C-alpha cells in the first residue's frame, strides 16, 4: 500500500511538512495476482467509477497498466511507477462502509494467493 500518511511511506516526512492537516484520499496498492487480478478488481467494483481523473467527489478506481499507461512499453511503465499489479483508488464522498464492502466483495472472488 502506498499512502503518504503512513509512517512506512518514503513520502511521510514531506506529507507531514506540506500537508499537516492530512493527506489525500488517494491510495495505491498491488495484487500478487498481477495484471489479470488487478484488472479484474478495477473492472468489477460497483461503487468505484472506472475513471482516470482523480480527486473527484465520487470514488474512482483505475488499473493504469491496462488504461492510462497501456501505450507505454513495460520498461516505460516501470519507470513511471506503474506496475502490472497496481490499482489506484481515489476515495470520494460515498459511505466508507459501502466502499469497503465493494472492494472486499471483489477481492474475495480472487484466489487467496492473488491477494496483497
Residue positions per predicted region:
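Conserved small-domain helix->loop->beta segment predominantly found in fold-type I
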Residues: 1-46, 52, 72-78, 115
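Functionally constrained cores in energy, signaling, and assembly domains
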Residues: 2, 42-45, 57, 93, ...
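Active-site lining segments that contact anionic ligands and/or coordinate catalytic metals
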Residues: 22-26, 56, 84-86
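Electropositive phosphate-/nucleotide-binding environments in soluble metabolic enzymes
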Residues: 32-35, 51, 93, 97-100
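Surface-exposed, low-hydrophobicity interaction/linker segments
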Residues: 43-65
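PLP-dependent enzyme catalytic core of the Aspartate aminotransferase-like
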Residues: 59-116
